From Swiss-Prot:
ATPase subunit of a proteasome-like degradation complex; this subunit has chaperone activity. The binding of ATP and its subsequent hydrolysis by HslU are essential for unfolding of protein substrates subsequently hydrolyzed by HslV. HslU recognizes the N-terminal part of its protein substrates and unfolds these before they are guided to HslV for hydrolysis. Pfam families: AAA, AAA_2. A double ring-shaped homohexamer of HslV is capped on each side by a ring-shaped HslU homohexamer. The assembly of the HslU/HslV complex is dependent on binding of ATP. Keywords: ATP-binding, Chaperone, Cytoplasm, Nucleotide-binding, Stress response. GO terms for cellular component: HslUV protease complex. One of its GO terms (biological process) is proteolysis involved in protein catabolic process. This is ATP-dependent protease ATPase subunit HslU. CDD domains: RecA-like_HslU. Belongs to the ClpX chaperone family. HslU subfamily. ATP binds at residues 18, 60-65, 248, 313, 385. Its main location: cytoplasm. GO terms for molecular function: ATP binding; ATP hydrolysis activity; peptidase activity; proteasome-activating activity. The keyword Endoplasmic reticulum does not apply.
């Protein structure tokens, strides 16, 4: 996992997310504490539990974006899920233990990818041997093989088509739930898993270019060199010690006192989450996984419900509270220009492919930020997401006629923005439907 300092994590998040210093600091400290715990002696390490986080803030201010960027930074098994996808055990839908099963699958893929790099050289030699077998036959003389090996390494045979035997992953086999099992405790049973184990690995012949065959064959040869048992144990260990789960939309599973009916299994989802966050053992097809040291970061807009509407026990298991601020006009302006892949940079690059140059002036950017902020305050505050709608409206004409404007420069200034949006943003009734 990553050994970045909290300051480095915050500065990395600053490249993509505007403001929200408190939230960035909280996740940076939590991530660094994962690393600190690994440095402790064994006896103390088991006692140090992660301090789970609850992020509260209106929609479109960066809660989900923080989780996405954190996933890339963490170099640890990371899963982002919406709490609304899950139902109480006994109802149709996914039960919360599926979160841990999915996390194990992610950890397995990460561990396998890392281990493959260690055996890549050996796997490449074995893959080259299989390509030569396909080109000249297994019984060809050594001189012939050497001659073709040289051509192969020089790239002369890259486009030649060959037939190779590869393992059949059985992706076309159906999956099904086990009837009568609440929440499908066994998860999805894959028929090909059962058949593969019963009849040994099946293979199929695939026809492909030499260049394309290397990726498939190197991956296959790498897997033969790996100890699958050890790989699985390492993945489970990684989940137990470094796993991070980001639970989005947690406010949507609050059962509000004044509203009855329709919320039949919402509080049940919270009850099911309790043992998972507190620490329990979840059975997966790869083995048992303890959740004591998995870090949970929950987030929600809490527009209608309040954090106090969560079950008291669940509130207690999310001790660190971070409030994210609504975006001001100045923040909107920064969102348009500062992030590494800001909206303006994206649109400039997109239209550049048609040889059209977009030139955004300062007053043009101000006008876009101003209109987005005023619509947010009069209609519904959806944060930075409003900028997508406004930008699409402003650039609608240019985007449509871009193919006829090759070689031209289009200046987006305040007058241009007001011409395309002015009346719309002033008319509240219209902007409710259009912006």
């Amino acid at each position: 996992m990553t050994s970045f300092s909290p300051r480095e994590i915050v500065s990395e998040l600053d490249r993509y997310i505007v403001g929200q210093r408190d939230a960035k600091r909280a996740v940076a400290i939590a991530l660094r504490n994962r690393w600190r715990r690994q440095q402790l002696p064994d006896a103390l390490r088991d006692e140090v539990l992660p301090k789970n986080i609850l992020m509260i803030g209106p929609t479109g201010v960066g809660k989900t974006e923080i989780s996405r960027r954190l996933a890339k930074l963490a170099e640890a098994p990371f899963l982002k899920v919406e709490a609304t996808k899950f139902t109480e055990v006994g109802y149709v839908g996914r039960d919360v233990e599926q979160i841990i099963r999915d996390l194990v699958e992610i950890a397995l893929a990460m561990t396998r990818e890392r281990k493959r790099k260690d055996v890549q050289a050996k796997a490449h030699v074995a893959a080259e041997g299989r390509v030569l077998d396909a080109l000249v036959g297994a019984n060809a003389s050594e001189a012939t093989r050497e001659s073709f090996r040289r051509k192969l390494r020089d790239g002369e045979l890259d486009e030649k088509e060959i037939e190779v035997e590869v393992a059949d992953s059985g992706g076309g086999m159906p999956t099904f739930d086990i009837p009568g099992m609440p929440g499908s405790q066994m998860g999805m049973i894959n028929l090909s898993d059962i058949m593969g184990k019963a009849f040994g690995g099946r293979t199929k012949t695939r026809r492909m270019a030499v260049r394309d065959s290397y990726d498939v064959l190197v991956a296959e040869e790498s897997d033969k060199l790996l100890d699958q048992e050890q790989l699985t144990q390492e993945a489970i260990r990684s989940v137990e010690n470094n796993g991070i789960v980001f639970l989005d939309e947690i406010d949507k599973i609050c059962a509000r006192a004044e509203r009855q009916g329709g919320d039949v299994s919402r509080e049940g989802v919270q009850r099911d989450l309790l043992p998972l966050i507190e620490g329990t053992t979840v059975a997966t097809k790869h083995g048992a996984v303890k959740t004591d040291h998995i870090l949970f970061i929950a987030s929600g807009a809490f527009h209608i419900a309040k954090p106090s509407d969560l079950l008291p026990e669940l509130q207690g298991r999310l001790p660190i509270r971070v409030e994210l601020q609504a975006l001001s006009k100045d923040d909107m302006r920064r969102v348009l220009t500062e992030p590494e892949a800001s909206l303006i940079k994206q649109y400039v690059a997109l239209l550049n492919t048609e040889n059209v140059t977009l030139d955004f002036t300062d007053d043009g950017i101000d006008a876009i930020a101003d209109i987005a902020t005023s619509v947010n305050s009069t209609v519904e505050n959806i944060g930075a997401r409003r900028l997508h709608t406004v930008m699409e409206r402003v650039l609608d004409e240019v985007s449509f006629a871009a193919t006829d404007k090759a070689g031209e420069t289009v200046t987006i200034d305040g007058a241009y923005v007001r011409k395309h949006l002015g009346d719309l943003s002033k008319n509240t009734d219209l902007s409710k439907f259009i912006l």
